[in-house]
């Protein structure tokens, strides 16, 4: 019996050796993951380590950071940093809508779920670019509704975005995501990924696939950098 247990342990270790945490979660621990024909942008994200078992509430007296991504598929991520632990509480996801339509939704969400809290808004630097039709920017539209949005960086540096999030993921208890932030969870679990290049084994696209999961993850990155 003891020999069988030893063999089982060795077989288990061989199975997971060199595998990404997301692979272990899906294949070995039977955790909720997202299958995709590509490579996750954040393979260190884990349902075990980074998702709260139930929704939690923000700590009073500490501002809530809101990460924003603009465009026709906008996203807002409500989060808070307490003692170097980031907690994502909720999200607002837009569908083929302008900043003019999205901004009131974000303001209403904040007032409903986090009354009395101060908010710090951080948005993609391209949110300062005018729209062809109106010349209004995402920043100016949000300001019209009483929300001052600042850019977390001046040049939208990709390496800075990735390294900032990876630092949080690799820090002990660095990130906790509430279950209600479902789209962000799916994005971090692999929905936000690099596409596999056909006919080139082991090769992936240099940039992540743009889709329903990329926008909330981009908003999350903006919040991490701006609020960090």
Question: What residue spans do the PLM features occupy?
Answer:
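Short, structured patches in soluble enzyme cores that scaffold and shape functional sites
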Residues: 1, 30-32, 80, 90-92
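Mg2+-dependent endonuclease catalytic cores in nucleic-acid-processing enzymes, primarily RNase H-like
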Residues: 82-209, 228
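Short beta-strand scaffold segments in enzyme catalytic cores
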Residues: 74-80, 221
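Residue-level detector of short, conserved catalytic/binding motifs and their immediate flanks
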Residues: 64, 74, 119, 217
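ATPase catalytic-site recognition across NTP-hydrolyzing enzymes
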Residues: 2-68
């Amino acid at each position: 019996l003891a020999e069988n247990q030893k063999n089982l342990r060795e077989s288990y270790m061989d199975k997971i050796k060199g595998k990404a945490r997301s692979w272990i979660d899906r294949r070995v621990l039977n955790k909720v993951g997202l299958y995709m024909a590509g490579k996750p942008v954040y393979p260190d994200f884990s349902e075990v380590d980074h998702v709260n078992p139930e929704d939690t509430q923000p700590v009073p007296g500490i501002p809530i950071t809101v990460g924003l991504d603009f465009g026709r598929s906008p996203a807002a991520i409500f989060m808070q940093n307490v003692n170097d632990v980031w907690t994502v509480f909720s999200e607002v996801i837009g569908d083929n809508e302008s900043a003019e339509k999205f901004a009131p939704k974000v303001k209403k969400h904040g007032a409903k779920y986090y009354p009395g809290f101060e908010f710090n808004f951080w948005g993609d630097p391209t949110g300062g670019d005018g729209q062809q039709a109106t010349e209004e920017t995402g920043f100016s539209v949000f300001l019209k509704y009483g929300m001052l949005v600042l850019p977390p960086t001046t040049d939208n540096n990709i390496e800075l975005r990735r390294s900032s999030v990876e630092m949080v993921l690799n820090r002990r208890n660095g990130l906790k995501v509430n279950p209600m932030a479902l789209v962000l969870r799916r994005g971090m679990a692999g929905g936000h990924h690099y596409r596999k290049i056909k006919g080139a084994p082991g090769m992936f696209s240099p940039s992540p696939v743009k889709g329903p999961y990329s926008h909330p993850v981009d908003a999350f990155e903006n919040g991490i950098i701006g609020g960090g």
